[in-house]
């Protein structure tokens, strides 16, 4: 049997019962479509989480206070990051000792009620140093960022995030030169940062930066820091720097057992890896739920093919009588099943693509239709056709020609 | 050449074995026109299935051109059928959603003949059987019974088989169209020298053959030359 005949027979058979073929295809369309849509939503989420991790800077090692486990600590923990175990001196020591570090930016962050011109908002105030803008990839839109001079002089100056600006002064206004009041202390606005896009868990645009010295003196009243961001030269030195900082701080805090450290040193690569592990799991979960509908679609194919084989028993008998071999018959039915899934897969991919675009358009959730996902969907749909078409095709091929001919 | 040696065919349904063919032996030489005649249920179709390599006997030997069919696999039997045998069934068994041309060329599809040659041969065969050209592209389920049977005959001939097996080819036709079909067989036999085995329960139909094998209850009751042969005037 020649390939073109196989196409001819397949077309003739499928078009003979258009409604049934259409409904069976629909099952596959829904299955493949939802798999494609779910994978694209999962990958979109992965992409935006990666982007937001990258947006906090590149090649970062972050030191945060931890809670001390062990003797006397008790079972209740105040939660990671809330402890006050990192001091300004730790930051200074890192700056001095870790020579591989490109820049070190300690910060103290807390939420305060802010008032300006009778409006008020509650937002994150970060006391930090000049290098923060480089380390954490903060771009200034108007005015300037905190300078080293500001830090030395304990200047009462502030740099606003765009969302905070919108809340306090209205959208699109220039806040430079205005005064804001934080915790009964007046700060002069000297700059406005560029928007980072408010994705992720915290809105990086709803924020106020002040000099770290000012924050420690006038707002917090102590010399603790909440995070020390260290930028490495390149991704390759991240692990070394992470180790060096750990060793340094253990020594400074007089802790012998690294298990009992009262701080934690996070490496941005680890964060990225953890996040991608999470998003991959999520994508897998979404795809497997969608995969169930694909299996249901496959069962639909099998159901239709079994019905077709029964209906066409006489025809199969005749074909065998005039010389068709088992292979010819099974190939014919397999081709029908694969064609159904192939068409369904094609429409499903288009539909899945369209619906993920629609999701982005209407909900703003990032989606990403990737070529491998499409290739996978295509492969899966063809495989579904083969798997679920195999049994009916074999059944057709195994029919005894005489039994098939006398079948009423 | 066909040779049946002590052929027995037993069907088993549940616990009961029914012997449909009991010790059938005969020979049919090339270029013979033989009718196998017997009442309904006597085992004619069963015998034809064995002759046509659609089935194998329970015991005994069936030789087609000296080859023992019972030793062949299902696919090898398919090859034999495709190369040597043309079938005409009582119920026509055409593909309903296919054109006349497609139906006639179907055996060539399985012989992997290219499309152009296939169509050419199908047209030739249809022309030779004087099948009106206006109907070549009709779907087979739009034809009359007589026309369907002529399509079925053309399909049986398109492979140019040496042996033509016809099971009640006139059973669904009126006398007149039946006569046309019988005339076609006589012509194929006389002018093209094909071996024809015609299965029927009607003595009138059997009398168109040269030789009549009479079976009853799975046994041959008589086998001999047809002395009052009906010849249809074949000068159309
Ligand atoms: N697959 C089968 N299983 C069981 N019995 C069968 C089978 N095929 C045929 N038979 C039996 O074998 C007997 C002969 O059947 P067969 O079809 O050969 O008769 P026939 O001579 O062709 O009859 P008719 O003229 O009615 O076509 C019948 O009694 C039938 O019931
Ligand atoms: Mg019969």
Predicted regions and their residues:
Chain B
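Conserved ABC transporter NBD signature motif
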Residues: 60-68
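Conserved ABC ATPase "signature" region
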Residues: 67-68, 116-134
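Short coil-to-helix segment of the ABC ATPase nucleotide-binding domain corresponding to the Q-loop/switch region
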Residues: 98-107
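Conserved ABC ATPase signature
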Residues: 138-143, 147
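Hydrophobic anchor residue at the start of the ABC signature
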Residues: 153
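Conserved catalytic motifs of ABC-family nucleotide-binding domains
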Residues: 160
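Catalytic Walker B motif of ABC-type/P-loop ATPase nucleotide-binding domains
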Residues: 164-167
């Amino acid at each position: 049997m020649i390939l073109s005949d196989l196409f001819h027979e397949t077309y003739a058979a499928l078009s003979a019962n258009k409604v049934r073929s259409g409904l069976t295809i629909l099952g596959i369309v829904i299955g493949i479509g939802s798999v494609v849509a779910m994978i694209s939503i999962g990958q979109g989420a992965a992409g935006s989480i990666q982007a937001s991790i990258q947006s906090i800077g590149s090649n970062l090692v972050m030191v945060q206070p931890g809670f001390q486990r062990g003797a006397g600590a008790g079972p209740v923990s105040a939660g990671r990051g809330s402890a006050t175990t990192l001091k300004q001196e730790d930051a200074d020591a890192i700056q001095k000792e870790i020579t591989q570090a490109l820049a070190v930016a300690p910060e103290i962050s807390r939420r305060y009620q802010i008032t300006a011109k009778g409006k008020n908002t509650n937002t994150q105030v970060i006391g930090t140093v000049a290098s923060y803008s480089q380390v954490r990839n903060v771009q200034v839109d108007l005015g300037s960022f905190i300078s080293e001079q500001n830090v030395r002089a304990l200047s009462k100056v502030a740099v606003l995030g765009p969302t905070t600006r919108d809340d306090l002064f209205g959208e699109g206004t220039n806040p430079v030169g205005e005064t804001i009041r934080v915790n009964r202390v007046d700060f002069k606005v000297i700059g406005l940062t560029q928007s980072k896009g408010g994705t992720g868990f915290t809105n990086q645009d709803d924020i106020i930066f002040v000099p770290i010295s000012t924050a420690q003196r006038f707002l917090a009243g102590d010399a603790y820091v909440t995070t020390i961001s260290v930028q490495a030269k390149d991704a390759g030195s991240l692990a070394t720097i992470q180790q060096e900082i750990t060793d340094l701080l253990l020594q400074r805090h007089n802790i012998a057992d690294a298990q009992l450290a009262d701080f934690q040193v996070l490496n941005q690569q680890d964060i990225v890896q953890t996040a991608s592990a999470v998003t991959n799991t999520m994508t897998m979960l979404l795809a497997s739920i969608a995969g169930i509908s694909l299996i249901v679609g496959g069962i639909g194919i099998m159901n239709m093919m079994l019905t077709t084989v029964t209906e066409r028993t006489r025809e199969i008998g005749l074909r065998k009588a005039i010389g068709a071999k088992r292979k010819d018959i099974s190939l014919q039915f397999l081709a029908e099943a694969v064609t159904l899934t192939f068409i369904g897969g094609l429409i499903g991919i288009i539909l899945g693509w369209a619906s993920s675009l629609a999701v982005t358009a209407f909900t703003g959730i990032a989606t990403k239709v990737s070529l491998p996902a499409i290739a996978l969907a295509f492969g899966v749909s063809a495989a579904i056709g083969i798997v679920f078409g195999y049994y009916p095709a074999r059944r057709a091929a195994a029919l005894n020609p005489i039994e098939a001919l006398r079948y009423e | 050449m066909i040779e049946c040696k002590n052929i027995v065919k037993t069907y088993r349904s549940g616990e009961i074995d029914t012997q449909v063919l009991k010790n059938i032996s005969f020979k049919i030489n090339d270029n013979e026109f033989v009718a196998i005649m017997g009442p309904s249920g006597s085992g004619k179709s069963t015998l034809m299935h064995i002759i046509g390599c659609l089935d194998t006997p329970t015991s005994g030997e069936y030789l087609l051109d000296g080859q023992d069919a019972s030793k062949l696999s299902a696919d090898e039997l398919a090859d034999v059928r495709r190369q040597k045998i043309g079938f005409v069934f009582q119920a026509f068994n055409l593909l309903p959603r296919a054109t006349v041309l497609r139906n006639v060329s179907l055996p060539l599809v399985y012989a992997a003949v290219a499309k152009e040659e296939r169509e050419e041969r199908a047209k030739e065969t249809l022309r030779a059987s004087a099948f009106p050209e206006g109907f070549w592209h009709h779907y087979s389920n739009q034809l009359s019974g007589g026309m369907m049977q002529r399509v079925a005959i053309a399909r049986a001939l398109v492979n140019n088989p040496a042996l033509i097996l016809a099971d009640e080819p006139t059973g669904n036709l009126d006398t007149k169209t039946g006569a046309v079909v019988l005339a076609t067989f006589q012509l194929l036999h006389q002018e093209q020298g094909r071996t024809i085995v015609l299965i029927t329960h009607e003595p009138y139909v059997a009398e168109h053959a040269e030789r009549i094998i009479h079976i009853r209850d799975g046994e041959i009751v008589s086998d001999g030359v047809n002395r009052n042969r009906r010849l249809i005037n074949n000068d159309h």
